[in-house]
Swiss-Prot record:
Residues 34-112, 120-200, 265-343 form the RRM domain. SMART domains: RRM, RRM_1. This is ELAV-like protein 3. It holds the Pfam family RRM_1. CDD domains: RRM1_HuC, RRM2_HuC, RRM3_HuC. Induction: By bHLH transcription factors atoh7/ath5 and neurod1/neuroD. It comes from the Eukaryota.
Length: 348
């Protein structure tokens, strides 16, 4: 049973990220005022509990808790379509920011997908370490309606890393923000900030990113190179503080991405500690965007982490940014290796 604890503001790193686009709608005004998307739902919440919670506000035409097609596990978000637009508005005002178990849910209108609202996500760097999320929003709000925002923080100290994301309602608003703020010094800043699109890279750009990541990894792990002839094992691809195989470098650096799964883009995370659990992956990847699923691979005997896990994110540019930021990241006494899951890993 889901226990309602309290109401509070939605946090950026609340677990699974925020999904806000409703595909397959016709974009009519009535639809846009009755369709809601609900993010950051507890993974053990059932369809019945989801319907009961939002049905307490008003008559529901339909609702759907989104699940993994293979495992049946909740992906942490769902859609609600009310009969009356007033009930949809009331649901946002009443339930947005509600704390359910360890999650704080976000309730908002599910915007129909259209060209005018795509690619409106900005990447901001060199922010003052003292700037918080609200102050960043105030800086950017003069250029348009902000849908989501977040500032990345150090997982240990909680101190800002000086990097943030701002998603505007429309691309043209994001363009104006770039024109107005890129290269400028906000109040309290010691250097100019960089503001640019965090767009989906092209296939060529994606391969270049992979090449860079694996060349960096290859430089980090020195020693003799050997061809890998045995059946692929995630543990053999990047052994901790040992030689990396030339097969994994050449194949992975030049490989075309396998494409998104039904749930999104799958990321391979290696060199986790035996004590690592799913919450560690949520905390690491949640700040970068919409995380739909995390899985730590455990030893059947000890139930301890075997050193690796997988994270699924819905958006390519957010997944790529997470990889670029977390590959080589020191977690405790370990250095993580983070990459897109490849076709070989799919077969493992």
């Amino acid at each position: 049973m889901v226990t309602i604890i309290s109401t509070m503001e939605t946090q950026a790193n609340n677990g699974p990220g925020c999904v806000g686009i409703l595909n397959g709608t016709n974009g009519e005004a009535d639809d846009s005022k009755t369709n809601l998307i609900v993010n950051y739902l507890p993974q053990n919440m059932t369809q019945e509990e989801f319907k009961s919670l939002f049905g307490s506000i008003g008559e529901i035409e339909s609702c759907k808790l989104v699940r993994d097609k293979i495992t049946g596990q909740s992906l942490g978000y769902g859609f609600v379509n009310y009969v009356d637009p007033n009930d949809a508005d009331k649901a946002i005002n009443t339930l947005n920011g509600l704390k359910l178990q360890t999650k704080t849910i976000k309730v908002s209108y599910a915007r129909p997908s259209s060209a005018s609202i795509r690619d409106a996500n900005l990447y901001v760097s060199s922010l003052p370490k003292t700037m918080n999320q609200k102050e960043m929003e105030q800086l950017f709000s003069q250029y348009g309606r902000i849908i989501t925002s977040r500032i990345l923080v150090d997982q240990v100290t909680g101190v800002s890393r000086g990097v943030g994301f701002i998603r505007f309602d429309k691309r043209i608003e994001a363009e104006e923000a770039i024109k107005g703020l890129n290269g400028q010094k906000p109040l309290g800043a010691s250097e100019p900030i960089t503001v640019k699109f965090a767009n989906n890279p092209s296939q060529k750009t994606g391969q270049a990113l992979l090449t860079h990541l694996y060349q960096t990894t290859a430089r980090r792990y020195t020693g003799p190179l050997h061809h890998q002839t045995q059946r692929f094992s995630p543990l053999s691809i990047l052994p901790r503080f040992s030689p990396i195989t030339i097969d994994s470098v050449t194949n992975l650096a030049g490989v075309s991405l396998t494409g998104p799964t039904t749930a999104g883009w799958c990321i391979f995370v290696y060199n986790l500690s035996p004590e690592a659990d799913e919450s560690v992956l949520w905390q690491l990847f949640g700040p970068f965007g919409a995380v739909t699923n995390v899985k730590v691979i455990r030893d059947f005997t000890t139930n301890k982490c075997k050193g690796f896990g997988f994270v699924t994110m819905t958006n390519y540019d957010e997944a790529a940014m997470a990889i670029a930021s977390l590959n080589g990241y020191r977690l405790g006494d370990r250095v993580l290796q983070v990459s897109f899951k490849t076709s070989k890993q799919h077969k493992a």
